[in-house]
Amino acid sequence: MRDRLYTTEALIIRRSDVGEADRILTIYTPHHGKLSVTARGVRKMTSKLAGHLELFIHTRLQLAKGRSFDVVTESRVVQPFRSLREDLSRISQGYYVAELLDQMTPDESDNPALFRLTCETLAALDVLDDVVRRDVILRYYELHTLILSGYRPHLFDCANCERELSPDADRYSPITGGVLCQQCSSNEPRTLPINLNTFKLLRYLARMPLETVVSLVPAPATVQEARLVLKASLSQILERELKSTQFLNLVRG
């Protein structure tokens, strides 16, 4: 239960204009989860909130309880992540992270670890110039969003029989939920190929903190294959492809 007037950190992950000057914001918070709130008059040039409630911003909000939506009364930017709104490649990645977070989380279900992961991911995307390194960060975010949402892919034991995987495991099953041993993969026709380098990359991403991963520059083909298997897992769970994927692919070329 939230107080009538409360303060929270928040990430702005979606927004829509309503009326002449208001906006409905979808925010993700560490202790209240995902909320829809209203920012009254924010589109007016004279609004004190203008510029403090942009997409992808990490902010600290003061909110008042309302009938339909809680109301933003104050906002103080914690991290602006300006590059995520100024560079087309980063814009597409910011939209992707925001939509993935939005679709993978129910309303008002707190997950502080997922909030921290998203802040760290946006911070890395904001400063990294190397395209491959930013792609690795997206793979890290996809994998750990799955993990923190209760869908940890099997990368160390077979997704079917749960025996320890050997380096010759080369099939990934989004339906079963991870890598299959050779014996089990022969009985599952709907699998994706996963080579040894991709297998090692996903294991590394699962084990290491993001601050270590930011310096990693694998072969682009390895990152691409990791993208395909993680995309398949996400599509299996969400039962659709994220809308921002098309924008991301278009910008990537």
From Swiss-Prot:
Lineage of source species: Bacteria, Bacillati, Chloroflexota, Chloroflexia, Herpetosiphonales
Function: Involved in DNA repair and RecF pathway recombination.
Family: Belongs to the RecO family.
GO cellular component: bacterial nucleoid
Key word Lyase present: no
Positions in coiled-coil regions: none
Pfam families cross-referenced by the UniProt entry: RecO_C (PF02565), RecO_N (PF11967)
Gene3D superfamilies: Nucleic acid-binding proteins, Recombination protein O, C-terminal domain
Domain of life: Bacteria
Keywords: DNA damage, DNA recombination, DNA repair
The protein's name: DNA repair protein RecO
Keyword DNA repair annotated: yes
Annotated NCBIfam families: reco
Xref: InterPro entries: ARFGAP/RecO, DNA_rep/recomb_RecO_N, NA-bd_OB-fold, RecO, RecO_C
A biological process term (GO) from this entry: double-strand break repair
